Amino acid sequence: FYKKHNLHGIVGGNTGTQMGGWFRKEIKTPADLQGLKMRIAGIAGQVMAKLGAVPQQIPGGDIYPALERGTIDAAEWVGPYDDEKLGFNKVAPFYYY
């Protein structure tokens, strides 16, 4: 089934609050993650690093301005419902879960 539909599994799972994130650019292939600076921590950060992203450790209050200035390319926080209240969608319009 997987080969027939060109599907490739990526081992991961629900890691708490770091489950998805807001991205300044659209991600179409795993290659798009190469060198991408993302505010993400813990095991999710380790997974993203294996995919080529560069995990960044910045305080929650600095996420919006860092996305706005382009200091980081992507960020995770709580989840889309709460994150939209903080306006992340205005500076990073692509959300992936």
Label each PLM-derived region with a short phrase.
Residues 2-97:
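N-terminal secretory/targeting leader peptides
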